[in-house]
């Protein structure tokens, strides 16, 4: 990876950010149908900031197979995990083609699958078998907890219990459902505001395994809250591809929503004096970023 454009000036603020291949601080993007050229442009600009690439719901069913294979090959070469949206697997389940689905996903070049029951009922034994089936076909299983219908939403503890069970059965990560709207689903109310009590319940029940959750958070206020709660290396999903750099700036404290707290903390601790005359200094002498570390380094929610 080449040096970033402003490293010589603000390189210190990036200290603490996990680097690829990341086990935490994942960014999962949703792709509704990017072509090869657009995908290449995105990877040139922000490829090292993307960890998971989801071809959302059933969109990949309409892409020419050779184009999809080339696209997935390019993404995999960059170390990005690729998978079709869970709704496509749910359709295959309804039509009795789930094993064929796994075989075909692997043949096309996907490296993972999303296993969900957002639309259909899925008994626990079938959920467990799907996780095993994915592994048997060389695919990394990523499950999703939650329902897409705003009128039928499971409680926070139910989401956490299912996530823990999925991880025990072999899921590598568990995504918390929010859809692409981020409203009226899961941990968000009808206006897209975070239900803080729900996040607290899930976090408490998950314990250290909360780091295996990918919180779908398509809206800026949701991303801000989760970064403030869990630190810059929280796993976030359903990020529009055009918002990857904006999210990274939010993680690093390079946007108002997170930088304001960093500036206040530096002033409070005497590391920055608004009245002081600036002296010539090297990037290494600049104060670090006290507000955007892992929650394990500073305590969840402490900035």
Segment roles from a protein language model:
Residues 3-16, 200-303:
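C-terminal alpha-helical cap/extension of soluble enzyme domains
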Residues 24-31, 51-55, 82-86, 113-115, ...:
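Hydrophobic faces of well-ordered beta-strands that scaffold small-molecule active sites
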């Amino acid at each position: 990876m080449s040096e970033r454009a402003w490293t010589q000036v603000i390189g210190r603020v990036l200290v603490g950010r996990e680097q690829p291949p990341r086990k935490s601080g994942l960014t999962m993007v949703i792709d509704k149908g990017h072509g090869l050229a657009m995908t290449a442009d995105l990877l040139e600009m922000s490829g090292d900031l993307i960890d998971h690439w989801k071809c959302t719901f059933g969109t990949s069913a309409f892409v020419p197979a050779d184009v999809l294979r080339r696209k997935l090959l390019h993404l995999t070469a960059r170390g990005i995990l690729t998978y079709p949206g869970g709704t496509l697997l749910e359709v295959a389940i309804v039509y009795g083609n789930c094993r064929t689905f796994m075989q075909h996903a692997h043949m096309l070049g996907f490296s993972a699958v999303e296993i969900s029951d957002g639309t259909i009922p899925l008994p626990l034994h079938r959920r467990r078998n799907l996780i095993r089936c994915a592994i048997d076909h060389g695919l990394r299983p990523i499950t999703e907890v939650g329902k897409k219908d705003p009128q039928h939403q499971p409680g926070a503890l139910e989401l956490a219990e299912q996530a823990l069970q999925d991880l025990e059965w072999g899921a590598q990560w568990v995504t918390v459902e929010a859809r692409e709207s981020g409203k009226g689903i899961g941990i968000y109310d009808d206006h897209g505001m975070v239900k803080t009590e729900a996040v607290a319940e899930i976090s408490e029940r998950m314990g250290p395994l909360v780091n295996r959750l990918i919180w779908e958070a398509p809206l800026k206020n949701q991303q801000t809250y989760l970064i403030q709660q869990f630190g810059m290396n929280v796993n976030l999903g359903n990020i529009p591809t055009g918002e990857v750099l904006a999210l990274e700036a939010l993680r690093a404290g390079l946007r108002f929503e997170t930088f304001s707290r960093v500036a206040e903390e530096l002033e409070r601790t005497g590391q920055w004096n608004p009245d002081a005359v600036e002296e010539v200094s090297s990037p290494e002498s600049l104060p670090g970023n006290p507000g955007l570390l892992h929650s394990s380094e500073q305590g969840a929610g402490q900035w």
